[in-house]
């Protein structure tokens, strides 16, 4: 009987289930969207039941499309939107809506904590204190949901990020992995345990926290009434860490960039915890008794800038048009676009920066804006990778996400980085990473070496730009960024 691995890829707006065979081919896929809820300005929530319903329907659809029986699934891996915070009872029933990573309701609370404890928190967790991470969201829930803290003190409340909630629903086991725990701002990434001092600062009772396990081990088995089979759930990693694993980024210095609405860049730093003033330090995964660390840079707006060309100023009808427009020009002709719609992320961390288009003349047309937008994505990526290179040597960039289909962008990325850019055959690297972690735990795949042999290159983009052109273009970009920074303060918005 042929066996397969099922990957659950739970994102911010949809839940997917993807079935892979031993050669990493996709043989079945199900995907269902679920809504976000906005009870107040700046607040973002999910209904955990809607997440579960979408995820379970996706599993059923993937099995049907693959014509695979549940008994043929050798293992299940889970990957998820990180930081999103859920509290539920011991029956798995949610006690409030999930507070999503994007939610800013705790921003003021975190600013107060940051002033007093910022350096200590970064030293323990690798994270710059922010409302983005789980700790303040969980504190808000305990402080504001009537009766929740009392129930928590009695042992009637469980906390988890989305992976924990899904695994609990599937197996009844209350667990998470190192990569997801490292995004809560409650986990000591050196000691590899929940940190008592941080729990005290945020007022979190330790009894509600999940057990932290490796990213590849059997956490439990699916309840038979769910799928008609007891399947091991044996892989777990946050979405960006799973993408690095799916790119076979196992060696120190290996880097992946995921180009989505925003972009996330992770560099494997091996067994060493490395700190950067302008990047986050995180755990990539735990495997075979060892933890691998990573540096992470998040870029707030990349693909969203292309969406703005389409939906905002309507100079294109579909994203793919940008490549054709950009290649009509020999150069950017001095036009730069800094897409700081919501400020700038790594390495600038300027929440007051705003979008800027500069260098416009009477001859500027939509092709200039299209090219400037694609180039901006590449410049922003170089900004992050330059920070990473201060701490770890980088030879190439492995890429995934929708924008990697744009050959102009990928070539310009290679040119401006002066590093080769590698696009793999399988684009679903996040789901694939979770599948690999699950499969390794049950010997479906035997080793990292076997996984490396499965990772196939679709296209390599070699740098072809001369050094002087590269220097001039990047200098222009840095000058444009300077002019965009702090603009919201200047105009008082």
UniProtKB/Swiss-Prot annotation:
CDD domains: FGGY_EcGK_like (cd07786). It catalyses: glycerol + ATP = sn-glycerol 3-phosphate + ADP + H(+). SUPFAM superfamilies: Actin-like ATPase domain. Sn-glycerol 3-phosphate binds at residues 12, 82-83, 132, 239. GO terms for biological process: glycerol catabolic process; glycerol metabolic process; glycerol-3-phosphate metabolic process. Coiled coil: none annotated. One of its GO terms (molecular function) is ATP binding. This is Glycerol kinase. HAMAP family: Glycerol_kin. ADP binds at residues 12, 16, 261, 303, 402, 406. Its EC number is 2.7.1.30. Pathway: Polyol metabolism; glycerol degradation via glycerol kinase pathway; sn-glycerol 3-phosphate from glycerol: step 1/1. Pfam families: FGGY_C (PF02782), FGGY_N (PF00370). Keywords: ATP-binding, Glycerol metabolism, Kinase, Nucleotide-binding, Transferase. Gene3D superfamilies: 3.30.420.40. Key enzyme in the regulation of glycerol uptake and metabolism. Catalyzes the phosphorylation of glycerol to yield sn-glycerol 3-phosphate. Glycerol binds at residues 82-83, 132, 239-240. Belongs to the FGGY kinase family. ATP binds at residues 12-14, 261, 303, 307, 402. GO terms for cellular component: cytosol. InterPro entries: ATPase_NBD, Carb_kinase_FGGY, Carb_kinase_FGGY_CS, FGGY_C, FGGY_N, Glycerol_kin.
């Amino acid at each position: 009987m042929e066996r397969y691995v099922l990957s659950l890829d739970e994102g911010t707006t949809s839940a997917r289930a993807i079935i892979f065979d031993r050669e990493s081919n996709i043989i079945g896929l199900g995907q269902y969207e679920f809504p976000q809820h906005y009870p107040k300005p700046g607040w973002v929530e999910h209904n955990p039941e809607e997440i579960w319903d979408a995820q379970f329907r996706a599993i059923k659809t993937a099995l049907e499309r693959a014509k695979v029986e549940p008994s043929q699934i050798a293992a299940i891996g889970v990957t998820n939107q990180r930081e999103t915070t859920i509290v539920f009872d011991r029956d798995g029933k949610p006690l409030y809506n999930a507070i999503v990573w994007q939610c800013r309701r705790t921003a003021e609370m975190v600013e107060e904590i940051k002033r007093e404890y910022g350096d200590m928190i970064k030293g323990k967790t690798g994270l710059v204190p922010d409302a983005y991470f789980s700790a303040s969201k969980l504190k808000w829930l305990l402080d504001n949901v009537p009766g929740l803290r009392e129930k928590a003190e009695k042992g009637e409340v469980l906390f988890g990020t989305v992976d924990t909630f899904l695994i609990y629903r599937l197996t009844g086991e209350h667990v998470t992995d190192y990569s997801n725990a490292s995004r809560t701002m409650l986990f000591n990434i050196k000691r590899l345990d929940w940190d008592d001092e941080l729990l005290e600062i945020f007022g979190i009772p330790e009894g509600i926290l999940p057990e932290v396990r490796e990213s590849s081990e059997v956490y439990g088995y699916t309840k038979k009434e769910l799928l008609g089979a007891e399947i091991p759930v044996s892989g777990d990693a946050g979405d960006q860490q799973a993408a690095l694993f799916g790119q076979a980024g196992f060696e120190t210095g290996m880097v992946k960039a995921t180009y989505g609405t925003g972009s996330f860049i992770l560099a494997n730093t091996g067994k060493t915890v490395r700190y950067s003033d302008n990047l986050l330090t995180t755990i990539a995964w735990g495997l075979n008794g060892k933890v691998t660390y990573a540096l992470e840079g998040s870029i707030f707006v990349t693909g969203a800038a292309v969406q703005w060309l389409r939906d905002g100023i309507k100079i294109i009808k579909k994203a793919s048009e940008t490549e054709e427009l950009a290649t009509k020009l020999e150069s950017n002709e001095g036009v730069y676009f800094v897409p700081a719609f919501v400020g700038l992320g790594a390495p600038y961390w300027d929440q007051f920066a705003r979008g800027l288009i500069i260098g416009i003349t009477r001859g500027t047309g939509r092709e200039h804006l299209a090219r400037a937008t694609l180039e901006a994505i590449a410049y922003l990526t170089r900004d992050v990778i330059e920070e990473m290179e201060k701490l770890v040597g980088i030879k190439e960039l492995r890429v995934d996400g929708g924008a990697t289909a744009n050959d102009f962008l990928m070539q310009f990325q290679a040119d401006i980085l002066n590093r080769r850019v590698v696009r793999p055959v399988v684009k679903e690297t996040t789901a694939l990473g979770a599948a690999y972690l699950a499969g390794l735990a049950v010997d479906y795949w035997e080793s990292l070496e076997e996984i490396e042999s499965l990772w196939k290159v679709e296209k390599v983009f070699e740098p072809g730009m001369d050094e002087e052109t590269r220097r001039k273009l990047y200098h222009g970009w840095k000058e444009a960024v300077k002019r965009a920074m702090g603009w919201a303060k200047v105009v008082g918005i």
